[in-house]
Amino acid sequence: MVRNINETFLKACKGERTDYVPAWYMRQAGRSQPEYRKIKEKYSLFEITHNPELCAYVTKLPVDQYNVDAAILYKDIMSPLPAIGVDVEIKSGIGPVIENPIRSMQDVEKLGEIHPEEDVPYILDTIRLLTAEMLDVPLIGFSGAPFTLASYMIEGGPSRNYHKTKAFMYAEPKAWFALMDKLSDMVIAYLKAQIQAGAKAVQVFDSWVGTVNVADYRIFIKPAMERIFAQVREMNVPMIMHGVGAGHLANEWNDLPLDVVGLDWRLSIEEARTRGIHKAVQGNMDPSLLLAPWNVIEEHVKGILDQGMKQPGYVFNLGHGVFPEVNPDTLKRLTAFIHEYSKEQLAK
């Protein structure tokens, strides 16, 4: 049975007019929710993602609590890496840690291929469960982008400056492009499998690409992104690109065969469009604002919505993930305000 879903989010991604501005929040399922924190007392992130019923519950929780217009699958960008031979551990207070970092072409050549139905069946089963039985809004699948995945694989974990990653990129270009090719193959297969399982849109997170300048992006990263989006495009679902601190790359993303350019708070929607961004836009509230008094939040959100609504194709989101300290009631109130205010303004 095919479930009827609210397609407002999908319409906005395609640049179509909507009755109100759709909203969802990165990390909407996570540490800000008391129910999630209780689950995390018993289970690790990977244990949750390996349990389709539990993972589906966590994914759906913010949809029920906040009335958002899309769900995003609960998992980590590192989830597919063990399938290609990368030993990943998520350490509390640190993040992903990789014991066997990439240091040479030989290390790159050891990486394998992903076969999603065999390697990550639990992720695909979670998608099938959510889309067949549980959700009344679209489910977003996602992947990390090759640069960000490579940065973890080379640094061995999170970094403040990504010196090792960029040094490898400059000093070992042959190995770098081989790594980009292997990761691109993985991302393409991984995203296609999520769509085949029922995801109605996909987002590619390039969390750390903001550390790279435009010239280097064009040489070392953009070809891989062009290949990913060109090949996933044949699946005919909206594709979203998002990075942090990457406003200087927005025009590069605008050139890619994708549907939605994700912005963080450093580049306003108005400025992005002035620069020639003609695709749908997603963003771009500073998540720190969620810790401010409501009257401050409301004033800022009005300003963001007023910019976003100037043309069709706008999805409200944060510029980064929800902080653990955020009160869930604030997110519920925020969604209601976005819906009410935008509906009123768009009806004029």
From Swiss-Prot:
InterPro entries: UROD/MetE-like_sf, Uroporphyrinogen_deCO2ase_HemE, Uroporphyrinogen_deCOase. Its EC number is 4.1.1.37. It catalyses: uroporphyrinogen III + 4 H(+) = coproporphyrinogen III + 4 CO2. GO terms for cellular component: cytosol. The record marks D76 as: Transition state stabilizer. Substrate binds at R27, Q28, A29, G30, R31, F46, D76, Y152, S207, H320. It is found in: Cytoplasm. Keywords: Cytoplasm, Decarboxylase, Lyase, Porphyrin biosynthesis. GO terms for biological process: protoporphyrinogen IX biosynthetic process. Pathway: Porphyrin-containing compound metabolism; protoporphyrin-IX biosynthesis; coproporphyrinogen-III from 5-aminolevulinate: step 4/4. One of its GO terms (molecular function) is uroporphyrinogen decarboxylase activity. It is an enzyme of class 4 (lyase). Its main location: cytoplasm. NCBIfam families: hemE (TIGR01464). Belongs to the uroporphyrinogen decarboxylase family. Catalyzes the decarboxylation of four acetate groups of uroporphyrinogen-III to yield coproporphyrinogen-III. Homodimer. PANTHER family: METHYLTETRAHYDROFOLATE:HOMOCYSTEINE METHYLTRANSFERASE RELATED (PTHR21091), UROPORPHYRINOGEN DECARBOXYLASE (PTHR21091:SF169). HAMAP family: URO_D. This is Uroporphyrinogen decarboxylase. The lineage of its organism: Bacteria, Bacillati, Bacillota, Bacilli, Bacillales.
